[in-house]
Regions:
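C-terminal catalytic domains of large/alpha subunits in multi-subunit enzymes
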Residues: 1-179
């Protein structure tokens, strides 16, 4: 994951390719391990490991909460927050009872977060770096882990997005199409 912000006051000559267009970088990575029930399509996130660059962290507990929150929100988009539409294009999931979001039951059994304090040589608040938005990308690791688990069983499987139990079962059914 690589995240950057452009500051308008920076000097960069596009035609000459000289200068620095960006001074604010955030690096990170994530891994997820999942388990799939081949009969129901349900999945469980067993382990998640996240490494995120924080610069000079202003509050490690708040930063950890922001990283976890962004991860869970993104994981929801990738695994359960489906937006079905009818033939007229109207959304069918418009209430809390029809739009599924992650619950406590969906949380990873084990989540480890390592925050790397890298310092910051450029202007930011006390040398801190972005914590709220960049970790959002880490939730994709759950979708890729589910896809890889399915492909270990059905190599030609195609998993749609989000990876709902129905989507997982449909991907597992591809094996029958190729028999």
């Amino acid at each position: 994951m690589f995240y950057l912000i452009c500051f308008l006051s920076l000097s960069f000559d596009r035609e000459k390719g000289k200068g620095s267009p960006f001074h604010y970088f955030v690096f990170g990575a994530a891994l997820a391990q999942v388990q799939i029930d081949l009969l129901t399509g349900e999945h469980q996130v067993l382990k998640v490991f996240i490494v995120h660059e924080t610069g000079n962290s202003l509050n490690k507990d708040i930063d950890r909460g922001q990283i976890e929150g962004a991860f869970i929100q993104s994981m929801g988009w990738c695994t359960c927050e489906e937006l079905p539409r009818n033939d007229k294009g109207h959304y069918l999931a418009i209430t809390p009872s029809t739009y599924k979001i992650p619950t406590v039951r969906d949380l990873p059994l084990n989540i480890q977060i390592e925050m790397i304090s890298s310092g910051s040589q450029y202007a930011s608040i006390f040398g801190s770096k972005a914590i709220g938005e960049p970790p959002f990308i880490y939730g994709l690791t759950v979708w890729f882990a589910i896809q890889n688990a399915i492909k270990s069983f059905v190599p030609q499987a195609l998993l749609k997005f989000p990876a709902t139990p129905e989507a997982i079962l449909l991907a597992l059914q591809r094996e029958k199409e190729f028999d």
